[in-house]
């Protein structure tokens, strides 16, 4: 009987240990922001001669995207430059502040007419088309896109996409 009791106690403790395991498994994060083919936590260097590069960020949430805020910090994409093309330095892709801003974001390819970001569980932030433009300013940067995602359960995550053109002279 004692042997069975000890066995049962050990089984319970083992089960409890496994069930309450506190590992940092990134697969269970409620919000993820990851570079496609690159580490978003490191500077993305654009080294092609024509300043082209695929710069796509994958964004996913379990509960649906509530906000996808983008803040631009760049030595060349100043507030004046961005205002000239009707783009603020900070905007919410899931909730554009106006129809005019939504149309501007669609025109830049940051939004789609056919796919809403708010409520979706995954989307991409693709700035590939802007790399030749940024490289054309002949300022290596850094050019930062601060991405903040909030899901419908209130979970938040921010990551900074930093782009640099090492072949350009300051």
Regions found by a protein language model. Name each.
Residues 1-7:
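Bacterial N-terminal signal peptides that target proteins for export
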Residues 29-170:
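First exposed extracellular module after export/assembly in secreted or surface-exposed proteins
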Residues 5, 13-41:
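Bacterial Sec-dependent N-terminal signal peptides
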Residues 2, 23, 131-133:
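Short secondary-structure boundary micro-motifs
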């Amino acid at each position: 009987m004692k042997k069975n009791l000890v066995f049962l106690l050990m089984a319970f403790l083992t089960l409890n240990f496994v069930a309450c395991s506190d590992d940092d498994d990134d697969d269970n994060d409620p919000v993820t922001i990851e570079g496609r083919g690159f580490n978003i936590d490191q500077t993305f260097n654009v080294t092609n001669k024509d300043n082209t590069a695929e710069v796509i960020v994958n964004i996913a949430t379990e509960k649906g995207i509530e906000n996808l805020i983008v803040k631009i910090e760049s030595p060349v994409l100043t507030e004046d430059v961005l205002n000239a093309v009707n783009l603020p330095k900070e905007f919410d892709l899931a909730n554009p502040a106006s129809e005019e801003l939504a149309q501007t974001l669609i025109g830049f390819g940051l939004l789609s007419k056919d796919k809403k970001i708010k409520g979706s569980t995954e989307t991409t932030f693709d700035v590939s088309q802007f790399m030749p433009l940024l490289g054309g300013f002949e300022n290596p940067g850094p050019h930062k896109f601060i991405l903040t995602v909030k899901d419908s359960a209130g979970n938040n995550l921010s990551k900074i996409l930093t782009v640099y053109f090492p072949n350009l002279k300051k």
